[in-house]
Amino acid sequence: MDQIEAMLCGGGEKTKVAVTTKTLADPLNWGLAADQMKGSHLDEVKKMVEEYRRPVVNLGGETLTIGQVAAISTVGGSVKVELAETSRAGVKASSDWVMESMNKGTDSYGVTTGFGATSHRRTKNGTALQTELIRFLNAGIFGNTKETCHTLPQSATRAAMLVRVNTLLQGYSGIRFEILEAITSLLNHNISPSLPLRGTITASGDLVPLSYIAGLLTGRPNSKATGPDGESLTAKEAFEKAGISTGFFDLQPKEGLALVNGTAVGSGMASMVLFEANVQAVLAEVLSAIFAEVMSGKPEFTDHLTHRLKHHPGQIEAAAIMEHILDGSSYMKLAQKVHEMDPLQKPKQDRYALRTSPQWLGPQIEVIRQATKSIEREINSVNDNPLIDVSRNKAIHGGNFQGTPIGVSMDNTRLAIAAIGKLMFAQFSELVNDFYNNGLPSNLTASSNPSLDYGFKGAEIAMASYCSELQYLANPVTSHVQSAEQHNQDVNSLGLISSRKTSEAVDILKLMSTTFLVGICQAVDLRHLEENLRQTVKNTVSQVAKKVLTTGINGELHPSRFCEKDLLKVVDREQVFTYVDDPCSATYPLMQRLRQVIVDHALSNGETEKNAVTSIFQKIGAFEEELKAVLPKEVEAARAAYGNGTAPIPNRIKECRSYPLYRFVREELGTKLLTGEKVVSPGEEFDKVFTAMCEGKLIDPLMDCLKEWNGAPIPIC
């Protein structure tokens, strides 16, 4: 620590004020902000998850993280809060200063004056003033019907309590340490005050909701809380369950203002939202890579040179992550072989939803990352008014309660979330559409009778609904500011409103990523089924060709024997699901193409075709009859083997870096291939994945997909 000289408010005498060397070198904080953006986004998310899983959150005022807020917000969780004992002296000093200054007759806002536009009023009854502050701010509406809920979720309340305590620990607010200990006891005993969902403009802080925390601490008769088992508690019952032996607090001058005049509700909820948004951003990157796998895409879109020439770090990282997933992928090796067959008859490039996914996701990741840093600064800030500067013996009147960083960050995050959802919808729409999905069945149907199986059709409709609502939520909140409180609060951040809307948005994005993930797993299984069915068809066509086409009537070698190689090429080229529900149908492409091969050979048979013994045309009927007798049974047997887990060709996904995610959905959650022949609906499987996602169980398999990534693109050779 270095020291700089500062003049006391009365002038004349100078005092030494401790300032970190880093502050002197970076007085505007831009350097620190830039330093915080170093390293990869993925590493940052991993660190966030690590902090989320720590058993204890040690609060000291300046090191609280998004992951820690998310951990404490978990209702019924086991993570505990501990207050840094080193903060006690600073907190006490500011509290003592308020009492001493009032005794000396110092005129301070919110201590001897009225509030806001009526701060011209004066009183010497500081305790009564704080009591009245809490009373008039208890202006929220809860309602008492089951159809509507106007109560802030417990998770958001817990986040707000944690963030507010963190702010007050820094010793600039004039509040007793014992009050902070009481809030901590409530947190550690899973007791949450009931806060109204609406009623704050997050400037002057989140006055209305925070007043209900103060109301519980002071034992207001209208105060309620929710206990560890979800039971409703009075203030008295809440104190008893939390083991707070001091009884209700009689607020001293400034303490009511210290409790309510801050941005903790908006920034607390923003922290929860950003934890989820960061995980969803990584999931979107990985899902885009798996989408490329099941779509038989071309991995060229991840080539590092393309993205290095664009310069944007979010894009470069998104591409590098996808490149890592696709590097060595068994699907990509197979896709390359497929693309090499008849290349001039296929699109040269994949569609935008696949090919430009790094360019699309990159800016969204940058926005979410920037918002994360902004909110992390906010939850470690001192954001009430006035600020008590004991070192300079003065109360500083300012506006740190203005939650603009929250409103702006949440608006930006919500826009990014909407863009991620739009990409997922575009990818999902391609996945279920047999015009675009490179051979997968329409609607990802898996039954032998597609006329009675419509697969993910309902899911696609639901995805359109989710995406539409998400795009609507992308509209900004901060452009709807209204002048409030007798035009004193004439500009205000709407931070909590924006956080709430972003919470809604991330919840909808989770619905979309859930649906997309289950759809991708369905596609993985269909590719597995496709391979086994194709091999069965190849084997059967080969056997029938050998039996029917090799020899003539008298056992002599027949010219038609040369058809077999070209017949097998047809099977390789033809998309299995275009014919496999009725493989020998004359209206389906397989039989048409096979017949065409034999016809072409017959036309090139020359003079020998005129001889009935050597005529290839004469073999067409026998070949088709034999195939009709054998192929449907073999296909049915192949489906049965696949269904009971004895398919001869293993699932390629097991050879891919994306396997941990698939394994989690299929094995750990117990979801199955969806078919019209089964009773299970898509929504039932979606619920399993969505619930696991909301419980944070998807994080480990997601990170397992990337555990070998070294944080850099594959070198350009």
Swiss-Prot record:
GO terms for biological process, alphabetical: cinnamic acid biosynthetic process; L-phenylalanine catabolic process; phenylpropanoid biosynthetic process; response to oxidative stress
Organism of origin: Arabidopsis thaliana
Residues bearing the modification 2,3-didehydroalanine (Ser): 204
Record's keyword terms, sorted: Cytoplasm, Lyase, Phenylalanine catabolism, Phenylpropanoid metabolism
Protein name: Phenylalanine ammonia-lyase 2
Catalytic activity: L-phenylalanine = (E)-cinnamate + NH4(+)
Role according to the record: This is a key enzyme of plant metabolism catalyzing the first reaction in the biosynthesis from L-phenylalanine of a wide variety of natural products based on the phenylpropane skeleton.
UniProt keyword annotation of Cytoplasm present: yes
GO cellular component, one term: cytoplasm
UniProt-listed Enzyme Commission number(s): 4.3.1.24
Family that this chain belongs to: Belongs to the PAL/histidase family.
Quaternary organization: Homotetramer.
Binding sites annotated in the UniProt record for (E)-cinnamate: 261, 349, 355, 385, 457, 485, 488
Keyword Lyase: yes
Compartmental location: Cytoplasm
Cysteine disulfide links: none
PTM entry text: Contains an active site 4-methylidene-imidazol-5-one (MIO), which is formed autocatalytically by cyclization and dehydration of residues Ala-Ser-Gly.
GO MF terms held by the record: phenylalanine ammonia-lyase activity
pH dependence, record text: Optimum pH is 8.4-8.9.
Pathway membership: Phenylpropanoid metabolism; trans-cinnamate biosynthesis; trans-cinnamate from L-phenylalanine: step 1/1
Lineage of source species: Eukaryota, Viridiplantae, Streptophyta, Embryophyta, Tracheophyta
Main location, first listed in the record: cytoplasm
